[in-house]
């Protein structure tokens, strides 16, 4: 029987994002497919694994397709001498850097298997993950910080009309109802990266129904906040703000995400509006789960009111390869994450 390789940390991605090291394809030399939006992750996670190994932290990357037990995988990727290496052997770690979102039953089952032992722990806090993964749950727990949010129960015209009616009532009762335009936003309830986010005018329920039936996903409705198409992200690690940046939507769009053409610009913490920092502090007191990596995204309405857009326990570690400033900032965050991973794995840090 082949010996199991034991790692200090195992990075786990879904097999829809990364390719299993167990693939028989001879033309696959990297985990993240070229020609996709995720191709740059090959550079990002190459740097991540290199930083781990430089600090005597053994690390590998695997996919949901490889999960074979608690903390266990049937194959994995290594990064050595600036090259990715496929290893078709069993790997194990009790510390997981989790990038696997349970967006379907398949991934829920894989994730449950991965963490089926109490001996295996994830880098991020499970309760916080569950709160931020579900946008309706985010609103239910943090409604005082968020724009009104309603889930569309079914992909039918009747359900959409009902949700729109409920949302309208919530807007009318909101103390800052003037912050909201007449347009509404429909979002994938469990989505990320600005994907499956749509804007509609009143009376466009037929279009909404068509999109829902085609996508077969669960959606929420929110009012479109009147703002300057800029959002602010605060990145926290071990209870402290370690990174701050703004994202500016591209011309003609309202989504600020980089994946949707938004421009990311790093700023100093001192440049973040003081009111946003105060709001974030109030929110964090309620969360009471700060010993982890997570981010909070805020927008400021044209009237000066602050809204939480979403939280994320897996903020992107990637960067625009064409912008050196972004590369250096992202690499700094990776080094901080590795430092915290080393602490959790009881390894002496040399960063």
Residue ranges and their predicted role:
Residues 2, 113-121, 126-219:
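Active-site nucleotide/adenylate-binding loops and adjacent lid/helix of ATP-dependent enzymes
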Residues 3-10:
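Extreme N-terminal starter segment of soluble prokaryotic enzymes
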Residues 8, 94-95, 307:
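Structural motif
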Residues 18-42, 257-263:
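A solvent-exposed, charged loop/short amphipathic helix patch at secondary-structure junctions
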Residues 60-64, 222-223, 232, 291-303:
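A short glycine-rich, hydrophobically flanked beta-strand micro-motif that places a catalytic Asp/Glu
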Residues 267-278, 285-291, 300-351:
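C-terminal active-site "lid" helix and adjoining low-complexity regulatory extension at the edge
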């Amino acid at each position: 029987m082949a010996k199991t390789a034991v790692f200090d940390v195992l990075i786990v991605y879904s097999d829809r994002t990364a390719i299993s090291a167990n693939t028989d394809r001879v033309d696959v030399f990297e985990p993240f497919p070229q020609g996709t939006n995720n191709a740059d992750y090959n550079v990002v996670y190459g740097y991540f694994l290199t930083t781990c190994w430089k600090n005597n932290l053994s690390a590998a990357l695997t996919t949901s397709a490889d999960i074979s037990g608690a903390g266990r995988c049937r194959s994995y990727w290594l990064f050595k001498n600036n090259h990715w290496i496929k290893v078709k052997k069993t790997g194990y770690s009790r510390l997981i850097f989790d990038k696997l979102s349970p967006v379907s039953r398949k991934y829920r089952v894989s994730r449950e298997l991965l963490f089926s032992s109490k001996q295996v722990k994830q880098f991020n806090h499970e309760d916080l993950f569950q709160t931020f993964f579900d946008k309706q749950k985010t609103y239910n727990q943090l409604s005082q910080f968020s724009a009104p949010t309603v889930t569309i129960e079914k992909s039918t015209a009747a359900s959409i009309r009902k949700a729109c009616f409920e949302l309208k009532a919530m807007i009318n009762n909101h103390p800052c109802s003037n912050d909201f335009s007449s347009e509404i936003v429909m979002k994938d309830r469990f989505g990320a990266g600005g994907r499956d986010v749509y804007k509609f005018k009143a009376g466009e329920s037929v279009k909404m129904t068509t999109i829902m039936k085609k996508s077969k996903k669960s959606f929420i409705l929110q009012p479109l906040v009147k703002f300057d198409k800029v959002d602010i992200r605060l990145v926290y690690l071990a209870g402290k703000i370690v990174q701050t940046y703004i994202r500016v939507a591209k011309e003609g769009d309202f989504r600020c995400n980089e994946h949707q053409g938004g421009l990311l610009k790093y700023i100093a913490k001192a440049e973040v509006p003081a009111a946003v920092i105060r709001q974030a502090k109030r929110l964090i007191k309620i969360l009471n789960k700060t010993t982890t990596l997570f981010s909070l995204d805020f927008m400021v309405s044209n009237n000066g009111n602050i809204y939480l857009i979403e939280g994320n326990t897996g903020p992107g570690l990637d960067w625009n390869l064409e912008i050196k400033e972004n590369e250096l900032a992202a690499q700094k965050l990776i080094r901080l994450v590795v430092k915290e991973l080393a602490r959790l794995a009881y390894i002496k840090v040399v960063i």
